[in-house]
Curated annotation (Swiss-Prot):
Coiled-coil regions listed: none
Classification lineage: Eukaryota, Cryptophyceae, Pyrenomonadales, Geminigeraceae, Guillardia
A Gene Ontology cellular-component term: chloroplast thylakoid membrane
Protein family membership: Belongs to the PetN family.
Keywords: Chloroplast, Electron transport, Membrane, Photosynthesis, Plastid, Thylakoid, Transmembrane, Transmembrane helix, Transport
Oligomer status and interactors: The 4 large subunits of the cytochrome b6-f complex are cytochrome b6, subunit IV (17 kDa polypeptide, PetD), cytochrome f and the Rieske protein, while the 4 small subunits are PetG, PetL, PetM and PetN. The complex functions as a dimer.
Record-annotated membrane-spanning stretches: 3-23
Nucleotide-binding listed as a keyword: no
Role summary: Component of the cytochrome b6-f complex, which mediates electron transfer between photosystem II (PSII) and photosystem I (PSI), cyclic electron flow around PSI, and state transitions.
Main localization, broad class: plastid
Protein localization: Plastid, Chloroplast thylakoid membrane
Protein name: Cytochrome b6-f complex subunit 8
Highest taxon in the source lineage: Eukaryota
């Protein structure tokens, strides 16, 4: 695995986590 795909996968994980966090916050957990 090269550094570019590693960076992209890390970015997708952070994006998905923040999106889920926003949804949870909007629903009041």
């Amino acid at each position: 695995m090269d550094i570019l795909s590693l960076g992209w996968s890390a970015l997708m994980v952070v994006f998905t986590f923040s999106l889920a966090l926003v949804v949870w916050g909007r629903n009041g957990f």
